[in-house]
A protein has these predicted regions:
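Short glycine/proline-enriched turns and hinge-like loops at secondary-structure junctions
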Residues: 82, 150-152, 176-180, 221-223, ...
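N-terminal glycine-rich flavin-associated loop
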Residues: 103-122, 148
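A short, Trp-centered hydrophobic/proline-enriched beta-strand micro-motif
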Residues: 134-142
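Flexible, small-/acidic-enriched active-site or ligand-binding loops
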Residues: 153, 203-236
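Long, acidic (Asp/Glu-rich), low-complexity accessory segments flanking structured domains
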Residues: 231-250
Length: 403
């Protein structure tokens, strides 16, 4: 199966029930609370954390106190029970301050979403309360060194042995992998690719699981991205999520939430780049006047603002559709594609507007420029997104249903 087939596979998974829409006033209050938190606690320290590539332990503890690890988890299971519209607003604000924080939340949320959508009641009761509180952090483990967008190459195996599965293989690009207590794992079983939740203690080694490599990155600093090697690791059969052989469509459906997250964090980075450019253009003067009064700069600012607003609306549309329980592979792909390209373009334009200062580490725009490419590549490259979008559109055109 190629990633272009992913839309069809995800559509085979049972649709989640429509979420209860969060009251608009509550949504605004939550997002404003996060905005103030970012301005007070994140923005002042982000440059140092970025430079040192240091995990933001104190900020993560404060995020736990705010309930940000349980935004979409139902209140009955200890979460805030908020909708995806609220979630993307939270992610945008975190990305505005420091994009790395959104990675800490995103893979955790995707792991929790897999359990919410496809886990049994017993599994939900067992895992989600500690995830909602942030006591246990989650990770998602789909990609492998030789299997990224081409999911047919997944080689990690889980072999049934009585009441357990024995897992062997290597997973790549695992965000939160070392610090996670729960890992949503895609592994090949006799029936096909199946989804499991692996329980582990945070750390580099645990009962046949080893962090075999820490990946150095251009941006996205402070959060670990690792390879994880499984050697005869035993997973209880009770940790199988849903039916054996149905893991791929389940996880690909969850990746729609991941792509909406990528889009919202791209909006946050793009907004930060735009605000930096707008502010600097009014402060910096050339030829006797602020550069904001030069027509060339005004044209750039107009285009930047327009793309930013379009990216935000595409992301909101995808979130609303997902929350309504509708298929949104096309909409999530469009949002991810456009918003990530917008973040890349706006970070470059912001650097150009800053001139030489934009190339220095004294200004935050160089960080936006380093962070933006992750959104173009992550959760399926933009080339793959275009294929998913096109296939989805053609499928809808052939259908008498949604067009």
């Amino acid at each position: 199966m190629t990633a272009a087939d992913a839309a069809d596979a995800a559509a085979d998974a049972p649709a989640p029930p429509p979420a209860v829409e969060t009251d608009a006033d509550v949504r605004r209050e939550i997002i404003e609370t996060v905005r103030r938190f970012v301005a007070r606690e994140v923005t002042p320290v982000a440059p140092d954390l970025e430079r040192e590539d240091r995990f933001p332990a104190e900020i993560v503890a404060q995020m736990r106190d705010l309930g940000l690890f349980g935004v979409t988890i139902p209140e009955s299971l200890g979460g805030l029970g908020l909708d995806l519209r609220t979630y993307i607003g939270v992610i945008e604000e975190l990305a505005y301050g420091w994009m790395s924080l959104t990675g800490i939340v995103n893979t955790h949320t995707m792991c929790a979403t897999l359990i919410m959508y496809h886990g049994s009641e017993e599994q939900q009761q067992r895992w989600l309360p500690s995830m909602a509180s942030g006591e246990r952090r989650g990770a998602l483990s789909l990609s492998e060194p030789d299997a990224g967008s081409d999911t047919r190459n997944i080689s990690c195996k889980a072999v049934r042995d009585g009441d357990e599965y024995v897992v062997n293989g290597t997973k790549a690009w695992v965000t939160n992998g070392e610090r996670a207590g729960l890992v949503a794992l895609a592994a090949r079983t006799e029936e096909g690719i199946s989804a499991f939740v692996v329980e582990k203690e945070p750390g580099a080694r645990f009962e046949g699981i080893a962090v075999s490599k820490h990946v150095g990155k251009l941006g996205y600093k402070g959060v670990e991205t690792v390879e994880m090697a499984y050697t005869d690791h035993r997973v209880p059969a009770a940790n199988l999520v849903g039916e054996a052989g149905r893991g791929l469509p389940q996880i690909l459906g969850v990746l729609e939430v991941g792509r909406i997250n990528i889009a919202s964090r791209a909006v946050g980075v793009a907004r930060a780049a735009f605000d930096a450019a707008l502010g600097y253009a009014q402060q910096r003067s050339t030829f006797g006047k602020p550069i904001a009064e030069h027509q060339a700069i005004q044209l750039k600012l107009a285009d930047m603002a327009t793309r930013l607003e379009a990216a935000r609306l595409l992301t909101r549309n995808a979130a609303e559709r997902k929350a309504a329980g509708l298929r949104c592979d096309v909409e999530a792909g469009m949002a991810k594609l456009f918003a990530s390209e917008t973040a890349l373009e706006l970070s470059m334009e912001a650097m150009r507007i800053h001139g030489g200062m934009g190339y220095t580490t004294e200004m935050p725009v160089e960080r936006y420029y380093r962070d933006a490419p992750l959104m173009v590549i992550g959760e399926g490259t933009n080339e793959i997104q275009r294929l998913v979008i096109a296939r989805g559109l053609l499928a809808r055109a052939r259908s008498t249903g949604d067009r």
